[in-house]
Design a protein with these regions (language model features):
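Histidine/acidic residue-rich metal-binding segments in metalloenzymes
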Residues: 133-316, 321, 333
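Alpha-helix-loop-beta-strand connector modules within alpha/beta enzyme cores
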Residues: 103-119, 169-184, 347
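Metal-associated gating/positioning segment near the N- to mid-region
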Residues: 47-116, 133
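His/Asp/Glu-enriched, well-ordered alpha-helical/loop segment
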Residues: 205-225, 229-234, 310, 314-316, ...
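Peripheral, non-catalytic segments of secretory and membrane proteins
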Residues: 480-521
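C-terminal cap of metal-dependent C-N hydrolases
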Residues: 330-334, 340, 390-455
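Divalent metal-coordination and catalytic microenvironments
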Residues: 8, 26, 48, 59, ...
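Histidine-rich, glycine-flanked metal-binding segment
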Residues: 2-4, 10-53
């Protein structure tokens, strides 16, 4: 199949220029100022439009079994929502139950995804327990047959996904050995569990309890701790869903000291805030329950966008994990039973454009970087993904920077009956989405084929992740001091050395040296 994109402005992370793009058999085969159409060639006109790399969402949870429920967006509906929003690749998470084989869990996720995806996808692996078998299986899944190059560790969800600090540290040592990226959900799970118990016993059962049980300081503390431990392990670290200024500051602090740490804000945290948890409508408040929670500071979304612009945060994602109103209502008497998760995979690109480019905070090239290219580089699929270039996959979006749309549950493609961005008008709209040379979204209509997406193996040893690690490791090597042998004196020698010392008995005097005290009792 061949396709020609005419008269558009190509935007990569490092350049913008007018050119045509010729696609054949899923690859970009030519980029030139004026490519002439040939008979039978499908032509897409992109006059006054931007031609950008398809978005890559590096953090989704499609059909995740969680808190006794299963996320509503499966790999079919979830990837349809993705392409409708201009995202052409997702990276989902294999999450084994505690003690489960990584290989068994991997096969289960592939069995769910392969028959359903309408765009390409990769996988990351969560480590929910630690043993020699887990370490061995980590090595196995980083091989080409499995294609995993990152491992996620939860410092929250005590008793379910959470690992202890020593397990986290051992896991990072193994990641460093395998040249795989460690990813972390940074919250203090032990303190959260205590706070939940206290709040419930105090009669606070509504969604406001969720945010009160997880104050921002606990995210900041866990982020700082995770960065410190990763530095000691000389392991690159990727902090998922950075939701607060404190967590972002912890990342910046360690990067300034030379640590290899990446920070990922998500669409929800860039476009809304935690005031919703205090809405008098219980269901409205419950819809926004996710972990870490949205910041209660209304200035945080803008601050996170400015940190993206400054390079202190590095790429955007969604943590898309959707539960409908019925599922959310299962926690009506206990906020700890509200399934955690929100939507985002369909609206991320428009949200970032609106709050970033349209607001004058980032330029279109930075937009491409934080929505596509950085993810491709970090997860080692660049320039196959994340770039408009000859030889790259034809994952392309025709972007109308001047158009607007109003986000609504009535028009979105998620499998849920609400949208956390409901009523928000955003600038920047994907008019056409192309996955591997196939048009999958055009004129407001899906043109997808279930199962047409492919699994993308992600090899370890990404250059942007590991290029600084080896030299840093040399600087961190233990230092041994070479000394002459120490010969301790024997007990007899020590006794003889003290033989001539005169020991005087204690003598009590009426007037001690320095005179008598003037204090009278």
């Amino acid at each position: 199949m061949s396709l020609l994109i005419k008269n558009g402005t190509i935007v990569n992370d490092d350049a913008m220029f007018k050119s045509d793009v010729l696609v054949h058999d899923g690859k970009i085969v030519e980029i030139a100022p004026s490519i002439q159409p040939t008979p039978g060639l499908e032509v897409v006109y992109a006059t006054d439009r931007l031609v950008i790399p398809g978005g890559i969402d590096p953090h989704t949870h499609m059909q995740l079994p969680f808190m006794g429920e299963v996320a509503k967006d499966d790999f079919h509906r979830g990837t349809e929502a993705a392409v409708a929003g201009g995202t052409t690749m997702i990276i989902d998470f294999v999450i084994p139950t505690k003690g489960e084989s990584l290989l068994v869990a991997y096969d289960r996720w592939r069995g769910w995804a392969d028959p359903k995806v309408v765009c390409d996808y990769g996988l990351s692996m969560a480590i929910t327990s630690w043993s020699p078998q887990i370490a061995e299986e980590m090595a196995m899944v980083t091989k080409a047959d499995y294609g995993i190059n990152s491992f996620k560790f939860f410092l929250a969800y005590a008793g379910v996904f959470m690992v202890r600090d020593e397990e986290f540290y051992q896991g990072m040592l193994q990641c460093a050995k395998l040249r795989a990226l460690a990813r972390v959900h940074a919250e203090n799970g032990a303190v959260i569990a205590e706070r939940c118990e206290h709040l419930l016993s105090s009669g606070i059962t509504g969604p406001e309890g969720h945010t009160q049980s997880r104050p921002e300081e606990l995210e900041a503390e866990a982020t700082f701790r995770a960065c410190t431990m990763a530095s000691q392990a000389n392991c690159p670290l990727y902090v998922v869903h950075v939701m607060s200024k404190g967590a972002a500051a912890a990342i910046a602090h360690h990067r300034k000291k030379g640590a290899v740490v990446f920070g990922e804000p998500i669409a929800a945290g860039l476009a809304t805030d935690g005031s919703h948890y205090y809405n008098e409508d219980w269901l409205h408040a419950a819809r926004y329950v996710m972990s870490p929670p949205l910041s209660r500071d209304p200035s945080t979304p803008n601050a996170l966008m400015r940190l993206l612009a400054a390079g202190e945060l590095h790429l955007t994602a969604t943590d898309n994990c959707t539960f409908d109103c019925h599922q959310k209502s299962l926690g009506k008497d206990d906020f700890t039973k509200i399934p955690n998760g929100v939507n985002g995979v369909e609206d991320r690109m428009s949200v970032v454009w609106d709050r970033g480019v349209h607001a004058g905070i980032i330029d279109p090239m930075k937009f491409v970087a934080v929505t596509s290219t950085m993810a491709a580089k970090i997860f080692n699929c660049y320039p196959q993904k994340g770039r408009i270039a000859v030889g790259s996959d034809a994952d392309i979006v025709i972007w109308n920077a001047n158009a607007t749309r109003t986000i609504s549950k009535d028009t979105h493609h998620h499998a849920i009956d609400f949208n956390i961005f409901e009523g928000m008008q955003v600038h920047g709209v994907p008019e056409t989405t192309i996955c591997r040379g196939r048009i999958v979204w055009a004129n407001g209509q899906l043109r997808t084929v279930q199962g047409a997406g492919r699994f993308v193996p992600l090899p370890p040893d990404s250059q942007i992740v590991f290029s600084a690690v080896d030299n840093r490791g040399k600087a961190l090597e233990p230092v041994k001091v070479i000394r002459s042998p120490y010969e301790a004196p024997s007990t007899l020698q020590a006794h003889d050395a003290n033989a001539n010392i005169v020991v005087k008995p204690t003598v009590r005097t009426a007037i001690p040296p320095g005179g008598a005290s003037s204090i009278q009792f």
